[in-house]
A protein has these predicted regions:
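C-terminal accessory segments enriched in acidic
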Residues: 1-170
Length: 170
């Protein structure tokens, strides 16, 4: 699925600051694939895109390309979460929750750990996720707090589905 992102200047964006200083840049940005948390598949696409780009620059074939088709790409309007849970009752209201993780280096520096946090609560029927859970029978033990580390257990008819403790998925 391809979506066109907003191209306004973002002061926190690495490449935008190089462009601001007058350096030409090529932006290659992508999400990931389901069941590919290490992003090995997407790296293949990055590599192929860089090869095609270098070839296009070397042969000047980019001069013959019609760039108007670029703006035919639909605008990205979907929120994609790592985990999306539908069918919860939160504070007496039926809702969905969207959960994302950030990766941090482990203490030994040899790997990373994922810390999950609640990124959205409400009607998320328009959203997608790498993992989606949906049931009318979910029970929740713990609290759902927006923008805080996930810290709850999710069960479906006494079967444990997910368990988070201080942001870590157990």
């Amino acid at each position: 699925c391809i979506g066109l992102f907003n191209d306004e200047y973002e002061p926190r964006a690495f490449g935008d600051n190089f462009q601001k200083l007058g350096t030409s840049t090529i932006l290659i940005e992508a999400g990931g694939f389901k069941a590919d948390p290490e992003k090995q598949e997407i790296r293949k696409f990055y590599f192929a895109a860089m090869l095609r780009g270098i070839n296009s620059i070397a042969t000047k074939s980019y001069l013959q390309k019609n760039t108007s088709h670029y703006f035919d790409i639909p605008k990205n309007n979907k929120q994609i979460f790592h985990i999306l849970i539908h069918g919860l009752v939160v504070d007496g209201i039926k809702a969905s929750i969207g959960i994302n993780y950030d990766e941090y280096p482990t203490h030994d520096g040899m790997g990373t750990e994922k810390i999950y946090s609640i990124q959205d609560i409400g009607d998320l029927s328009f959203c997608d996720a790498y993992q989606t859970f949906s049931s009318e029978n979910f029970s929740l033990n713990g609290e759902i707090i927006f923008n805080q580390n996930a810290n709850f257990e999710l069960s479906d008819k006494h079967k444990m589905i997910l368990c988070f403790q201080n942001g870590q998925l157990l």
